[in-house]
């Protein structure tokens, strides 16, 4: 059947404009601050500064230049797998391709405003079916666009892509099941999948919950035929959008961060009791900065997106709705989601049962909460009956947070203190803003609820309050790191030309950084040891821990691990000038100051070993395990690590490393090892957009080592003939070459991309035929309104 709300004039573009210009007003003051005192474009904190700005700038240039292998990504990684989680499937990223790469930092705020506008419009489109009143449906969209989840995740930026697109898929599902509309659902499934495969896994779980709750609430009534068509459209949409899924899946299966299952009680209970308190208050208080802990100090709280706050109205409308409409599907959905939030294994179901805690799926029940709130408010009699009590309960529960500021305790010296909070001022700001919202809502309810334009008044108040609390959140997050990030632009964007002029371009080499910001390699288009990206080549994750470097979300080898720099062909370290004294105090061997830029002192590595060299000896895994992880790099400068099969194949080319050499780890020995590796270097090495080439001219057969992360996507040829690639040193590469002059070529093709692209292309063709069939059928039924 065709529902009546579609006959009403859509206010989509009004909601879009309201959300867009509210976002403009939200960011404008902070953009002005950055223009005047921050060095230029808007920068924020943490991931936004260290990842999102430079990812967008770098990916923009990389896509336009073409290629498959990114040398500037850590030690080198496949471009598709490194950036598909962050931006490569995002329609907002592809829209930004009209902007020159050099101007991308200035495009970040307009893109954020656009995402919030798209989110608001999508929330409105989904809500208007259920709310059945245009004004209140518009409010639902605005609440969704400026929820605590949206404001919090400005920090991560690309999470907002998911927030923006999800409501359209949910609305298309409703249309397909309730109104028997065909054709739209596969499109939105495909777009959400290609946008972000990680979040899509959670969306699939939520859609299943939503579907069964709708069926249980008798809003979804479908027979076998309609169910089969829905299954067909779902599969078709997944096939259309799988272009990045297979490559990502093949990579993630090798990534240790994605394989972290629960055990025992971990399935049922969080390890810290305070986690439950943090989840509970996430619906009541506006969110704190992502990198702070406020009310609770124990548990996994930072960077988890743990917030379900709605501006001004809070959770009161949702509580009242659930009491008033106990058998409504929204009530079922919200109750199931609450259960999921408090049970670890259910929470992790949105992340393929990974035991790492995140709340990054909350935007989906938040959308339902917005719909439930506006459903209640659009029915005056129902709201009059249920809302006051829920508002009083919400007020009381919010006030209980004060306990954390006054509860008595003891400090480290045994003195009596009040409160368990580290930053009282920050807490009172958050608590005060939250209570201000409750008071404003209560006053508006008391004085305006019977006015004819009550919905418009409340919408204006929600948008106005979103500016207030959103600006407070931005300020708490941004300016708490002002001293750290005030030189961000000077060390990155403004230093591109200076660094390019200061560094020689006579050979391939890596750089390192000390006391500087993350991901300098992306700005300067060079491989840099300090790198912040969760989805780099999996072999990097395997290699670094074996040489004493923790590798989780980023690579940060300590400067004291100086031998690692020789092994990985690091020629220069860029030392931030305000950290130069700290650097020189370390007195690391082999570094000489050779120049400077406005932001950096340049130190050259006297023990630099150009990329590509051979060894005289090999070392076994058993031998290497006798050496502490932090000192293994020095042994690997002396001998290549081979497994038993490789020793059988290449043992005749190399001598086994004597055991006494395992203890010879002096600075002089390191310098001698580097000199020996330089002498055994390849004749030429050239990095390309698809891998690299090298030339050799050895007198004997050799196993040539390259400190490039091993990847199944690489294929190698020697003199045009296919050659086997050896995985050595727990994650790097080597290839056998015969004596004499040889040309080596390593070419990278993203594993699975060709297959997934073919599947997507075929599915899109099928989808086109499917749409054509729908159109022809409609035209053959002139009386149909569909």
Question: Model features per residue range: what roles?
Answer:
Residues 29-167, 191-195, 278, 289-301, ...:
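Active-site lumenal/periplasmic loops and adjacent helix-entry segments of GT-C-fold
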Residues 647-786:
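Active-site-proximal, structured, solvent-exposed surfaces of multi-pass membrane proteins
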Residues 46-59, 91, 226-227, 234-324, ...:
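Periplasmic/ER-lumenal interhelical loops and adjacent helix-loop junctions
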Residues 81, 85, 462-487, 499-568, ...:
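Extracytoplasmic/lumenal acceptor-recognition loop(s) of multi-pass membrane glycoenzymes
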Residues 220-228, 317-341, 453:
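Membrane-interface helix-loop-helix junctions at transmembrane boundaries of multi-pass membrane enzymes
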Residues 23, 113-129, 135-217, 229-249, ...:
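Membrane-embedded helix bundles of polyisoprenyl
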Residues 5-81, 480-499, 503-518, 522:
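Hydrophobic alpha-helical membrane-insertion signals
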Residues 180, 199, 330-492, 739-786:
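Contiguous transmembrane helix-bundle modules in multi-pass membrane proteins
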